[in-house]
Amino acid sequence: GKLEEPVPYDRLQAPGRIQALFFRDRVKGNAEVLDREALERAARFASLTRPDRVWVIGLAAFDTWANALQNLPGIEDYWSGYGGNCYVAQCVRESRYMATEFLKRLSRKYPGARSRHLQEGAKQYEKELKLMEEFTRIFPYKWPIPEDWRREVQRHKIEKGAEILRKMRPLEEAAIKEMKKALEEWKSA
C-alpha cells in the first residue's frame, strides 16, 4: 500500500537496458488525422533504405541478416554474434506483434476498403510474427550469458534461421503494399 521512490535510470543496475517512453500530456487533435499520420509514418519507416555498407535497414535487412547468420560459428564475442542475433530477433518479433495489433485496431475503426487493406496488412505481419516466434525458439535470448552458448551455434539451426529470415521479406513487402493501399483509400474517403 505504500508508494515506492522511483529509481533513477542510471542506478537501476539492471542487466542489459530498459527502454521506455512516457508522455505526460495527452495528444489532442483529430483522431482520424492522427491515425492516418501514424499509418503514413509506419509505411515510410518500413520502406526506409540506407545507402551505406555498414547499416542495413528496411527490406534488405532480412537478406543481410540471413547471410550474416552464416558467420555465427566464427564470432567469439557473444554480443557481436550469437547473443546479438538472439536479442535482435526478440525485438523484431515484438515489433511484428505491435504492427499486427496497430493495423487490426485501425481496421476496426475505419470501415470499407481501408479496413480490408489494413486487415490484409495485419495478416502479413501476423505471418511474420509466427515466423519470428519460430526463429526465437531456435535462437532463444538468455540472460545472463550462458557459459555453454557456443554449443547453440549449430549448422542446422543456422540454416533453418536463414530460411525463416528469407521468408520475411515478401511478407514485409506485402504488408507495406497494403498499408500504402489503405492510405490511398484514405485520400478518397
Question: Over which residues does each language-model region extend?
Answer:
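Charged, long alpha-helical assembly modules
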Residues: 87-90, 94-189
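Noncatalytic regulatory segments and standalone regulatory/sensor domains
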Residues: 1-108
